Amino acid sequence: MHHVLNSTRPDHRFWFYDDVTQYGRTKYLNYYTPLVLLIFTVLFITYNIWKHYYYYDVLHLKQKNPIDELLYSSTDEDEQSPLINNNTITTNYVDNNCTKDALKNRHFSLEKLKSVKVNGEPHGTPEIVRRGFIEKSRIILEFFLVLSQVIIHSFILLHYVNKNPEFTQQGTITGLVEWCALFIIVSLRLANVNQNFKFINKYPGNLWSVSFINYLALFISMILPFRSIFIHHINSPISRKYYISQISINLALFLLLFFARIRNNFAIIYKTDSWITPSPEPVTSIAGFICWAWLDSFVWKAHKVSIKVKDIWGLMMQDYSFFVVKKFRYFVDHKVKRKRIFSLNLFFFFSNYLVLQCFWAFLGSVLSFIPTVLLKRILEYVEDQSSAPSNLAWFYVTVMFVGRILVAICQAQALFFGRRVCIRMKSIIISEIYTKALRRKISTNKTKPSNEDPQEINDQKSINGDEESTSSANLGAIINLMAIDAFKVSEICGYLHSFLEAFVMTVVALALLYRLLGFAAIVGVLIIVAMLPLNYKLAKYIGDLQKKNLAVTDNRIQKLNEAFQAIRIIKYFSWEENFEKDINTIRENELSLLLMRSIVWSISSFLWFVTPTIVTAASFAYYIYVQGEVLTTPVAFTALSLFTLLRDPLDRLSDMLSFVVQSKVSLDRVQDFLNENDTKKYDQLTIDPNGNRFAFENSTISWDKDNQDFKLKDLNIEFKTGKLNVVIGPTGSGKTSLLMALLGEMYLLNGKVVVPALEPRQELIVDANGTTNSIAYCSQAAWLLNDTVKNNILFNSPFNEARYKAVVEACGLKRDFEILKAGDLTEIGEKGITLSGGQKQRVSLARALYSNARHVLLDDCLSAVDSHTASWIYDNCITGPLMEDRTCILVSHNIALTLRNAELVVLLEDGRVKDQGDPIDMLQKGLFGEDELVKSSILSRANSSANLAAKSSTSLSNLPAVKEQQVSVNNNSSHFEAKKLQKSLRTEAERTEDGKLIKEETKEEGVVGLDVYKWYLKIFGGWKIVSFLASLFLIAQLLYIGQSWWVRAWASHNVIAKIIPRAQRAIAFISKKASHLIDWRGSSQISMASAENQPSSGHSTMYYLVLYLIIGFAQALLGAGKTILNFVAGINASRKIFNMILNKVLHSKIRFFDATPTGRIMNRFSKDIEAIDQELTPYIQGAFYSLIECLSTVILITFITPQFLSVAIVVSILYYFVGYFYMAGSRELKRFESISRSPIYQHFSETLVGVTTIRAFGDEGRFMQENLHKIDENNKPFFYLWVANRWLAFRIDMIGSLVIFGAGLFILFNINNLDSGMAGISLTYAISFTEGALWLVRLYSEVEMNMNSVERVKEYMEIEQEPYNEHKEIPPPQWPQDGKIEVNDLSLRYAPNLPRVIKNVSFSVDAQSKIGIVGRTGAGKSTIITALFRFLEPETGHIKIDNIDISGVDLQRLRRSITIIPQDPTLFSGTIKTNLDPYDEFSDRQIFEALKRVNLISEEQLQQGATRETSNEASSTNSENVNKFLDLSSEISEGGSNLSQGQRQLMCLARSLLRSPKIILLDEATASIDYSSDAKIQETIRKEFQGSTILTIAHRLRSVIDYDKILVMDAGEVKEYDHPYSLLLNKQSAFYSMCEHSGELDILIELAKKAFVEKLNSKKD
């Protein structure tokens, strides 16, 4: 043997017996290896020099900087131009040659976003990391090591070539040339160590990579010669010294570069904030990448202290959403030649990463068979030690160990590339959804059947521009697209390589099986192929169920969102139980689909469990009965190991098919959403060349091209530029629609709509007057951000203190800021929840006024404020200095106030212009009715104009302050002055803290508490069900082990008899051909193609075969059974959890909803519930199964080789520490990832509700940037969570490799005491142990991370509840009979730490009397009303109704006994009937009567029988607008978004009329209704509620002037309480002052006197 290995004869074998031959060393390792590397090096450098010379020297192309490519758009050369150019003043900002698409693109293009944050600061700063002393020392040391190699090879060439057979001339010369080339390369790198030589930087390419590849290949080529020295097959001293020096120097060179932090060029890190540590990836060595050591410092810190948000590192520059989406949009817009669907664009965009992922997956799949291939060799050695030398057996064990490590590296890299694609794809999908939601139409209003796509089901959009309801109709579906669909689509990318892995592993396994079993393996393949269609059908069915489930989930989330958005009205009417029942009905449908999916999944699991058993049994049967072979231990266990390896990819393929189908469903939903129609705003609006016109030219406009129930018809209006234009008309006449048409939100059927400009806000140029040619818009229902008051007013405009103060004063907000504890730094909550309706409206108005827009559109902004505030706003804001030379188009019902300074009045009626022109001309035509106040107001226009001119002459800086007595009661001025002084002395930080309303989302620290597990397990079914399931798992695992043991028994009963001659001839032929290069002693008779065949003794083969099948089927049945039982228990637990937290949230105190954004609540009910529904149970099952698998493996190996116990202890300790360190960081990252999702949902919710305002301001870019920022805040913990996962997986694999090595080691130590069957069981389980251990830690971490969802949901079990079903006394059945109210010494706070908002208020209300409550906005009027519903519990005092203290009355009874018509009218998706009579308590005739009484339908229509059938016929014609209230089945969108604000208020009034309550409360119920309709409704209220007690909050003093008493509130105190006429007799009274400031004093005195006289006369009667 030694002679053959070192013979000089021309034997061309590379390997002989147990070692590489001398020919193999000299020819393949010393000659071919350096030759190939030399050719590669020369070609690489030559190609790079040619490429750079040709492109940059010949073609003169600009060399691109990768940083600049990311920072700046390559398509926008003006990207970095100044935002404001003070040297350029122009009125025409629109390039008339610019296409409509280009204009739209400038608004919504993600590619054109600037690399700045929302606040205008740079997005981040790239910083170059230069080489330090250590890195430079590395290159110097490398230089000398390469030089030493040149010297060594020169010495060998001169002294030993042809003298020693190890050193051939061609090999030595080639090696010398190779090292000379490497010496030149390292010299160039050393010379350019500071990157000073442009030639080296520009031409040769990445020389560092060339060096590294060469060193690595040369080091690997020396491993086998070094082994030859180790086993004494090379004995020549010089040869031994040569190979030892080569492996030493090559290893040193390899390690120098392997651990180098900075490679070819300087590393670049990207810093976004000073307190955020940038990602260390750019300065991480290859070693750090492979073993994930770059995360060590983070893991160590997380172990020592609980990490905070600031401790989470930043992302790599290329991973930030801004750069990702920018590159994606550039790719789609410029590199995609034809329009492709979204999914294909994603695929091609990430193709490079996916190819790399597949490369690593392919490599890992092939290497994963090394242990199995070597398993047979080891078992053959155990069975017959003469078959190979012992050093070869040790070599096999070592290779198994190394092979497992290489597989771990490959799998980790494949998963990491996939995860990187995942976070980038998630950024793209969410940003595309968000951008689409900003730019799509809002006018569609369709109802789809329930089996349609869920996005379409919820596609209910606003048709009137009301910001409160613009997008809430489909908000649930959009949240679902983000929270679930975007995640599912992006998540699949992390595992796409599994398809390739499954394919490669299947092919390799089948090839090896064929070599092992021959045609018997084909039988197994055919069975697998036969099972594929069935599994495909099951996977498809699971996908169909998932699609249906997502549709129902959309419906549930929509219903939840609707309930949480309207929680106040639900509590007012005590509808919690009804909504809970409706939501739970949907929930049951969802859970039934989940259960069905689980059953199908279990059937699929059974098939995947049983398939390997059937395949193995069939193959063995064919092998024995047809081929006539006898099963031996090596063959049996090698086959079992291969079938196990085959099962893994098939299992993975099963799961992946299911996941891919689910992801395809999600991707289709996203695609459908992205395919929805965009807004036609930029296509249909005509931009005025002079930049100053608002006009309609023969325009006919509807909300939808196909649905034209309401139209603006034949409009011809030319609005006055730089002047006040007022649009008036009755409720539902189309006033808001007209503004929406100007904003481009409606559908232009014909004609033209001319606007002055449509430029994006970031491109606006400020003119000499400080204005921009843009539009500001204030909606009818105020839209506010969940931020401070100040930030809402600024709306990201630069802060100008003088202008800001002037705006605050002009909008009457100065005193409100003095009342608020934190002033303008007060957080106003979601939708401005902490402010009154009037305050919200004025903040919204202040935003429009503060903007530098030259054109302002105001939609009924005076309706929510009291009369004197309305007068102040009109004089100082709408017609004040700040509005000078600005075009203002105002929609208003308050014609007496608003017409006097109007240049143009447009009167609308039923969608047509009834008349337009100068208000005096229209007055003379009698178009304004007989109201004397209107007449006097218009006729005094000349005087008002003079006053306006006087005000206009006052400069902004000298804008007069608001007189304290003008906006408050005189005797309170000193109080507020003192408060103002006190406030000014406090720091802004203190004010900010005082102003905080929204609580930070809570985050537990450390391990998920044991109480959380106990709580969940109790709901899961308690210890009984857990114990039962655990026993099923144990029995299933015992059966699995029993199968292997049975195979051992089967094979052990065979004895050697004879070898079939035909098999011998085949083996000899194959061996002869295979031994051309490699010769194995003994393997010419025993190869992978066959094994020694032994006839059986004892039981027959059929006996073993049948029992093997029985065990396999039993194990599969148990596996499927435990799966379905686990799913059933999990679904039942999920049902209970959902029901409990829904009940808790719906019955929580209203303060919870004020302090908790809806997006945060929706996060609990969407993503967290989805995790509990679909992820937690499978993860628990998987983790428990992996635990049993690992424990059984360790016990089994220890039983077979007791010495393994020492390894098991060490392995267990290592696993504990690795798991401990991992869990410390990962659980916190998971919590931060969960918390950081809520702001994304909240931001979606806010911005989509205000989409009309955002588009009006042209501020889409800023909101898109903010969305990207919030995505990044979520991506950071998400990304590092999965990097931590890779950190864990690598270490688990390393430790698992020790198990394989230990098992092999102790088998060889105990070789004389073991049979091959026991050794086969030990090694087979050791090979699979690593995978099981990895999944154990990974799945346990997933369990804990998903238990975080349980933990977060459990928090809502501790929400403070309203005292339902708690009562000290039970009122009589007819209570309240009289309606008498007594309020005594009442004080209220919104929260214990907040100041009192109601202060010692006392008053009484007689039965059946009517009380008007008036006062400034924010005076506490609405708070008094809510106190009657016990939204706030009294700090002092009490409220009694009919002499019963309401604090002792059951809440449900109380709230159903009184009725409120709230300030913000709330309707629900459904029909007119379901909104008025949700629980079918009234007849259609009663409902029509209620509609008639609130003037939504006329008596004439009702008498003509305009019922459902006739109205349906009428609605088929589009010639005239149809009254939809004639058909009770007419659809109402969520929030009533397809009705005007006034119509919604009337609907709410009609709903209350139906209930005929004894006490009715009206909170600005007619604020958005025209005065004429208001008068009729007030008459209806007086008539219909004669026997009821009425409390009305009103800003229109005329509405309550004839009431029995007026309650004047100010700053939470009662200032006056008497008959209105009595109050007016006192000219010093606050009420008199209010009437005086309203401009209606004389009329109000007359009406009050008339009511007073009538009351006196009625008493006499």
Curated annotation (Swiss-Prot):
Residues bearing attached sugar chains per UniProt: 6, 97
Which stretch is the leader sequence?
none
- S-S bridge residues: none
Q: Tell me, what does this protein do in biology? A: Vacuolar class C ABC transporter which regulates the translocation of phosphatidylcholine to the vacuole lumen, the release of lumenal calcium stores, and acts as a negative regulator of vacuole fusion. Exhibits ATP-dependent bile acid transport.
User: Per UniProt, which keywords does this protein have?
Assistant: ATP-binding, Calcium, Calcium transport, Glycoprotein, Ion transport, Membrane, Nucleotide-binding, Phosphoprotein, Repeat, Transmembrane, Transmembrane helix, Transport, Vacuole
- What species is this protein from? Saccharomyces cerevisiae (strain ATCC 204508 / S288c) (Baker's yeast)
Residues annotated to bind ATP 2: 1415-1422
Give the Cytoplasmic membrane side ranges: 55-74, 155-166, 227-345, 415-495, 541-602, 666-1053, 1136-1178, 1222-1292, 1337-1661
* Lineage: superkingdom: Eukaryota
Concerning PANTHER family, the annotation shows: ABC TRANSPORTER ATP-BINDING PROTEIN_PERMEASE VMR1-RELATED, ATP-BINDING CASSETTE SUB-FAMILY C
**What InterPro entries does its record include?**
AAA+_ATPase, ABC1_TM_dom, ABC1_TM_sf, ABC_transporter-like_ATP-bd, ABC_transporter-like_CS, ABC_transporter_C-like, P-loop_NTPase
Name of the protein this chain belongs to: ATP-dependent bile acid permease
Which Gene Ontology BP terms does the record give? Answer: calcium ion transport; monocarboxylic acid transport; transmembrane transport
Q: Which residues carry this modification: Phosphoserine?
A: 936, 940, 955
Q: Which residues cross the membrane?
A: 34-54, 75-95, 134-154, 167-187, 206-226, 346-366, 394-414, 496-516, 520-540, 603-623, 645-665, 1054-1074, 1115-1135, 1179-1199, 1201-1221, 1293-1313, 1316-1336
Pfam families linked: ABC_membrane (PF00664), ABC_tran (PF00005)
- What family is reported? Belongs to the ABC transporter superfamily. ABCC family. Conjugate transporter (TC 3.A.1.208) subfamily.
Molecular function via GO: ABC-type transporter activity; ATP binding; ATP hydrolysis activity; ATPase-coupled monocarboxylic acid transmembrane transporter activity; ATPase-coupled transmembrane transporter activity
State any further remark.
Answer: Present with 3000 molecules/cell in log phase SD medium.
Asked if the record carries the keyword Transmembrane, the reply is yes
